[in-house]
């Protein structure tokens, strides 16, 4: 038997699964396109407000910093899930598991320190931070004659 025939003999079920999955996706997308209604009015892209006329724009612009902090949160949150799984199995893992978790926490801490040092968690860019000069400091001593 040739190599190609052996590969097909071992993986025919996976190939059939891929063909059926792609065919089902194409069928559903084509069916939705052919059977779906077409809205041709001006109000097609206006959000539904329960019969009340819309006021203003429905779009909310968020700073790119929000998405950056959200990504950092997701990354560190997933790593916290790994620590939770370690905490559940702490009796089985013993001292070796404790040392591995300590190294993992130190790597997380190094990543957090790096993010702080780079300024990735600062909300305002450096150019917009106001520099404190001597004239901005309020004089707390009373120089008025009494």
Curated annotation (Swiss-Prot):
The chain crosses the membrane at residues 14-34, 68-88, 96-116. The keyword Transport applies. It catalyses: a quinone + NADH + 5 H(+)(in) = a quinol + NAD(+) + 4 H(+)(out). It is a multi-pass membrane protein. Keywords: Cell inner membrane, Cell membrane, Membrane, NAD, Quinone, Translocase, Transmembrane, Transmembrane helix, Transport, Ubiquinone. It is an enzyme of class 7 (translocase). Its EC number is 7.1.1.-. Pfam families: Oxidored_q4 (PF00507). One of its GO terms (cellular component) is NADH dehydrogenase complex. One of its GO terms (molecular function) is quinone binding. Its main location: membrane. It is found in: Cell inner membrane. It comes from the Bacteria. InterPro entries: NAD(P)H_OxRDtase_bac/plastid (IPR023043), NADH_UbQ/plastoQ_OxRdtase_su3 (IPR000440), NDAH_ubi_oxred_su3_sf (IPR038430). NDH-1 shuttles electrons from NADH, via FMN and iron-sulfur (Fe-S) centers, to quinones in the respiratory chain. The immediate electron acceptor for the enzyme in this species is believed to be ubiquinone. Couples the redox reaction to proton translocation (for every two electrons transferred, four hydrogen ions are translocated across the cytoplasmic membrane), and thus conserves the redox energy in a proton gradient. NDH-1 is composed of 13 different subunits. Subunits NuoA, H, J, K, L, M, N constitute the membrane sector of the complex. Belongs to the complex I subunit 3 family. PANTHER family: NADH-QUINONE OXIDOREDUCTASE SUBUNIT A, NADH-UBIQUINONE OXIDOREDUCTASE CHAIN 3. This is NADH-quinone oxidoreductase subunit A. It comes from Pectobacterium carotovorum subsp. carotovorum (Erwinia carotovora subsp. carotovora). The lineage of its organism: Bacteria, Pseudomonadati, Pseudomonadota, Gammaproteobacteria, Enterobacterales. The gene is nuoA.
